[in-house]
Amino acid sequence: MNLRNLILLLILAIGDVSSAAGRPNILWLSCEDISPHLQCYGYPNATTPNLDAFAKEGVRYTHAFVTAGVCAPCRSAIITGMYQTSIGTQHMRCSAKLPDHVRPFTKWLREAGYYCTNNSKQDYQFKTPSGTWDVSNAKAHWKNRPKDKPFFAVFNYGGCHESGLASEGKYKTVTKGLKPHDRDVVVKSLPPYYPDTPIVRDDWGRYYDVITAMDRWVAEKLEELDEAGLADDTIVVYWSDHGVGLPRAKRWLYDSGMHVPLIVRVPEKFRIDGQGKPGQVSDQLVSLIDLGPTVLNLAGVKVPSHMQGLAFLGPKTPSPRDYVYGARDRMDERYDIIRAVRDRRFKYLRNYEPFKTYYQYMNTPEKGRLMREIRRVEALSDISPGVARFLEPIKAKEELYDTDADPHEMHNLAADPMFAAELKRMRQAHLDWVLQTRDLGLVPEAEINARQAKLGSAWAILSNPDAGDLISKLRDAASLSLDGPKAAAKMIETLHEEDATIRYWACVGLGNIAREIPTSQKDKAAIGLQVCLKDKSENVRVAAARALCHMDFAEEALPVLVEVLDDGTQWARVHAANVLDEINAQARPVIAAMKRNKAYRKGLVAEGKYTVRVLNRALNELEGTNNTVK
């Protein structure tokens, strides 16, 4: 090789190294199930010296929120930059099919030359596409990257997951390195929706303990960067996947479930237009759906146009958000469709199933000490107004909170004339979002599965060219179901709509007002619902059966529910089991069928355990037993 060629190769090699060095490494430190209960966020009970110091080196965001109050739907939104309700990943432990254009954002990072690792939680609710990560397992680490590549690395801390509070063994394992003074937390106050008892105070103290353990883990990960001499080359993002892992927080859309810590440290060389100044506190509204687009923007990669998240750091960022949005759908074995909109001050909630109690019996939280304590004081009728509020049998159709004056969201302002303008504004923001994002949560789950099998993805159900104005009709039908007896005639008319999802909401609405349907409309309603018992859609049949049971036509409706239990698809069976639990004593004639179906089935998600859980609960209530299932 002559000297000229050697020099040329050296120049090219140096150029490659400079290119890699010129782009930031990006490190995510994620944890589970905590709200911003860190000392740097103003909580003196927290022992978080490492995160407090980290916040002084970066930007602490005070208004960061997730898109759901539980991990898997949130994580699907974070990794794709798409609302879970747009791509069909909103139901807990579902399995959505993605359209070809939607992929984990790491695909574009890897194409741009980044080495991408994940250690190690995925939990995306869809099959992870090949090529998403260079490595994704418990040994994945940025240290193993090729020397000429920048990295994007994710480490997840699971020690503060709700299981760390509920399981004595896990709690001891997670906190075994803490000194006695680290555990010496004096819980001065509790959220007003919890009973003030020693057990609840102990659980809240444990919550602070696992946060302290997590803080030490953060220190270890930051120290690794320092030791490698990469702190000045690496943007570090710390976040939690949702709020506190305790009742009325996890799985819920109150700030206790949606509000999360977010701290970003940007080395000086990567700061743009004053972004990322050390010690800065930002009240900009951020949704964690924005994390993926932000990483791409910081890495110099074009953000795909289909992404719904908005980059909040890097060059040419879009205008800050006016609102963040959240969605609750099926949580394990229980359906409860709720939507949330929040600005910097107000929170709006739309309860699409207000006739379901707040605390539906759900296996996992009911095993926790705090939920058991709530049930204990409920049985004794020894409850404060704050606790009683969330034990009411039904919910309001709409909720509105001034989070500045009422941070625990205890005082619903939706009926207060002084806040009528705010209610109207926030309600419209929700309705607009349903249309703009094509909210699949309004499509019953069994119907989603059937349609995505034909169309290739859940996204296509409301977004393919043939969908037309289905989302508009769906939004209106779901809203109509909440309008009470005055809307009975319109609901009956809607029973004859062409699309099953619209018929479904008409059945739901009539079931909600079953005993209040105007006398002049009762016969028409009963006849229309009886026709729906033979509908081709499982969800329509189940919803019609529910309505007829509440109209005292259980003799005709129960065989339909049993048929779905016996031979229906997985999520239709869960739906039918929930209706049998709801109608309580009316289900006595089919106890034998319920017992027959309280069995695990091979080939279903988790062997159909959600149907088993609901039927077990219903049978315990009917027979006065206390049987348990996994």
Where are these regions (language model features)?
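…; additionally, a secondary subgroup of soluble metalloenzymes is captured
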Residues: A21-P24, H496, G509
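Amphipathic alpha-helical scaffolding segments comprising HEAT/armadillo-like alpha-solenoid repeats
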Residues: G484-H496, E516-L533, A554-D566, Q586-A599, ...
